[in-house]
From Swiss-Prot:
Source organism of this protein record: Escherichia coli O6:K15:H31 (strain 536 / UPEC)
Name of the gene this protein is made from: ulaF
Record's protein name: L-ribulose-5-phosphate 4-epimerase UlaF
GO cellular component: cytosol
Domain of life of the native organism: Bacteria
GO biological process, one term: L-ascorbic acid catabolic process
Listed InterPro entries: Aldolase_class_II_sugar_metab (IPR050197), Aldolase_II/adducin_N (IPR001303), Aldolase_II/adducin_N_sf (IPR036409), UlaF (IPR023499)
Pathway(s) of this molecule: Cofactor degradation; L-ascorbate degradation; D-xylulose 5-phosphate from L-ascorbate: step 4/4
Function: Catalyzes the isomerization of L-ribulose 5-phosphate to D-xylulose 5-phosphate. Is involved in the anaerobic L-ascorbate utilization.
Length: 228
């Protein structure tokens, strides 16, 4: 697990590097599906002092199998998403400013241009709010459940992120670094959407044919963006 712990550590350290977290407001995890184990950031440990060996290994029930610290308080959310969506290899949660603003406003991040369409096929959805019973009960688990309720059976890698109402963004990818990449893009397109709608409040969504072109040339079966 040492290699995966190093990858998760590096991905977590990317969060302050890209300006996605303040203090300890974020976490990254990755899963080893063959072993059924997840590596995640320890709860409340400062990035300035954190080391790869500080990463915590848990099983799919959340039991700590390796590590001296308690795992992230959001571990149950990560595990619920891994259990539901086999294509996920890494998950990120942050409170990045612009994506969190959309979450607090209770609005999906609208697909307005090609930057968005290169990564997200359609709007980045916003979940419903959790009920008092859901919050007072298994809050983090129920956060995962409301994300799943919103995504349904859609392939999560086609829209690799969501904003949880009154909370903040979650992003995911094929591994930890890919998940962080998508979290960075989500924050940028959230900022772009806010600015664009401020300039033109009547702004419509990107044309569907243009969105399809940009997404499919990068992610479709005949994708031709980048190098082989």
């Amino acid at each position: 697990m040492q290699k995966l712990k190093q990858q998760v550590f590096e991905a977590n350290m990317d969060l302050p590097h890209y300006g996605l977290v303040t203090f300890t407001w974020g976490n990254v995890s990755a899963i080893d599906r063959e072993r059924g184990l997840v590596v995640i950031k320890p709860s409340g440990v400062a990035y300035e002092t954190m080391k790869a060996d500080d990463m915590v290994v848990v099983d799919m029930s959340g039991n700590v199998v390796e590590g001296e610290y308690r795992p992230s308080s959001d571990t149950a959310t990560h595990l619920e998403l891994y259990r539901r969506y086999p294509s996920l290899g890494g998950i990120v949660h942050t409170h990045s400013t612009h994506a969190t603003a959309w979450a607090q406003a209770g609005l999906a991040i609208p697909a307005l241009g090609t930057t968005h369409a290169d990564y997200f096929f359609g709007d980045i959805p916003c979940t419903r709010g959790l009920s008092e019973e859901e919050v007072q009960g298994e809050y983090e688990l129920n956060t995962g459940k409301v994300i799943i309720e919103t995504l349904g059976d859609a392939e999560p890698l086609h829209t690799p992120g969501i904003v949880v109402y009154q909370h903040g963004p979650f992003a995911w990818g094929k591994d930890a670094h890919d998940a962080v990449h998508n979290a960075v893009v989500m924050e940028e397109v959230a900022k772009m959407a806010w600015i664009a709608r401020s300039i033109n409040p009547q702004l419509n969504h990107i044309d569907s044919f243009l969105m399809n072109k940009h997404f499919m040339r990068k992610h479709g079966p005949n994708a031709y963006y980048g190098q082989k």
